[in-house]
Amino acid sequence: MMRPVLFAAIILLTLTTTAPALVYVEKKGVLFYFPENETEIAAALTEKMPEFISFLAQKGLAINHPLHVILDDKLDEPQVKVHVIPHREIRIPLRAPGVLEDGYTRENPWAYFLFKGLCLQGIYGIRSGIPGVLHKGFGDIVSPNVIIPPWVDDGICGLLYAKYRGIEIQDPLEAAVFHASPPPDLDIISHHPQIWPGYHGYRIYGKPFIHWLNREYGWSKILEFLQLHGRGIVPFEIDLKAIKVFGKTGAALWSDFQKAYTREIPAGQGLLITGYWGEPFVYWNRAGVYPGKIQVRQRGRYGYVEPDGTLWVSQYDQMARLYKYSKGTVVSMDFKPVWDPGPGRVAVTRLGHRPYLIIFADDARGGFRHARRSDRDHALLIAAPAGVIQLPGPVRDGQGRIAVAANTAGNWDIWVYDDQWHRLTKTPSIEMDPWWEGDSLVYASNLSGKFQIHAADQNQLTQSAYGAILPRHGKYLNLTGRGWKLQNYKLGQVAFAGLAYPMDARIEAPAGHSPMETKPYTPFKSLWPNYIRPDLFAAATDLQIGIATKSRDVTGNYIFDAGIRYSFDTNFLALGAAIQVRRIGARYTRYPLSYTTALDQTVDEARNEVKLFWRPIEEKTISIEDLLRAADGLELGEGLELSVNWRTWKPLEGEGSYRDEGWAALSFVKHWGILGGWGNLEIFTENRQSLSLGINLLFGDQIISVMDLMAGRAWGEPTLGHTTFRIGGNIGEGYFTRNPSRLFP
């Protein structure tokens, strides 16, 4: 009797855990969550949201409810995240985009991300026919339009935003790359992000393609295609739907688009560069670091290289952090958020949405080895000027002065900090990429209509045909039709003009908003899932069918899953349910276990298990919004877990009474770069113990190989299927046990 009472008490205790520091407002089926100290941004978004929804509805993109919108303090990646399960969700990064990142020219980038998220929700919500019928039974997991190429849905949302605002569809650099060469083949855009123009080719060419499609065929045809795709039972198939709507396949439409923008194919070959360092020459992009490791990551534009070639660069792993690339190894620093490391140990961080420069303690090599949480008290923080929402690419000279680009309502200028802030430029153009030249500065600007390198007095130093950016060590990136070429901006330059700051560096304060009536955060508004997933396992020995669902609240601190599965071979109905609140959780499972070893040892048991666990150390290895993509949302990703377990079992067939046993377990999972390890110690009653360990090694560049080693041992009297180590078995095992399917039933 005590065990069920204890189980219920722990569940109640976990459900009353203190909620995150979030508040929310609810209007007409839209729940908007945000940090309680970010009401200014939230108020502006809630004011604009009805207008956005109305505009999209007029275009045929109705927004389904309920809808959860999150202004996410733990998201730095410069793009909106949109999901339809376990609830309809739009996740907006609280960090404003850096220069050349999506949305960087928008007066209010959070409003731009909100519009884009609403647009995608409108596209994903279009379904009819067989998907419409299945949607009534299984929920939002039936959403064919989720499977649309990014150059289509990004292009559609870009077109609608441009129509709504009455602006150009592309930002200045996207337009420059687009006009530098003819559009490449569709295969390059869809499948080869390592080839020029790179990963963001879907943005560079998708927006003009949809704009051309709208001009040639009209918006009604684009909407008709979305509606037809939303009723298709083979969502990957596009060409037949395109023929029915446009009279041509998707490839033929792209070919017509290419013909409409025919240009001379440029000679020579450039490089695919996101960022670089001039001395020694090192460059990087999304695919990897050169020279160095080929590893796909979303890297920032700015970095710092030590004389021995050690590179410091920022990467977006949900939140931004610094990485050290040195001699084939990659090490991440645990201080976050931080991005854009530059010379002089300076980088950028934020408190809420407001950016700060941060100067880390000296590591004697000019690097960022003190970018650790344990050294945070030794770092110096410098707040951005009032009204500035982003400070990308800081560089610090020998005198301690820091030059940086700054974004004010979508306008970018160069600022200098020398114990106080000075605004060096004040133009409606985009100024970025500052670099010290002695006592003076150079930077990139599109003041002339194209990006060129300019001196501090705005004197233009380059005459690039398409664009010049990122001055470093006398070099700059010159845009060509086939990539970036490294050239010299110092040719013929004797000296650079000195710094002269305009007298007025004030920024007009943005208009205030009406006070908001908010409610304290509750997880139950978003915890209940909006879908049921059909489940099927078929093998020569068994057929199993069932349904399952998983969910989480918008913070990821509350996780729930449940499911049932029927086995025709064993005539057994398995079921499981679990909940986790922050670091504490509980699970119940009912499942069969039936196998025969090579030694003709047989286990046939019907089991019930209860597990209570606590994770004093847990590192999220996947982002909150991608939690459902893991094998199990409650699985220990990395860290330490202590658990208390209780099991009852009886023979799977025939008569027999229930027996029970209890045990305590200690589990760990840890990764050190390419090496990972795990272990599980179980201490049973009646003086029985069981230990299993494993390591895995990942190696290779473009093709990754994995080597796994496992070992195990049991002490005391071994109990078959309980404390014994076993390799082999049916991959269907472990569905509800959450133990590895080939290790330890």
Write out the residue ranges for each language-model feature.
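C-terminal outer-membrane beta-barrel translocator/porin domains of Gram-negative envelope proteins
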Residues: 588-603, 611-616, 623-745
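Acidic/His/Gly-enriched intrinsically disordered linker/tail segments
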Residues: 85-89, 94, 102-109, 113, ...
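A short beta-strand motif characteristic of beta-propeller blades
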Residues: 267-268, 293-297, 329-337, 379-387, ...
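Beta/coil-rich, acidic/histidine-enriched accessory regions frequently appended to metallopeptidases
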Residues: 24-26, 51, 224-321, 328-331, ...
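Outer-membrane beta-barrel initiation region
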Residues: 259, 267-270, 490-590, 612, ...
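Juxtacatalytic substrate-recognition/specificity segment
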Residues: 21-143
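Extracellular/periplasmic ectodomains of large secreted or surface enzymes and adhesion receptors
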Residues: 255-279, 285, 334, 352, ...
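A flexible loop/linker signature enriched in serine peptidases of the S9 family
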Residues: 170, 286-289, 298-300, 312-323, ...
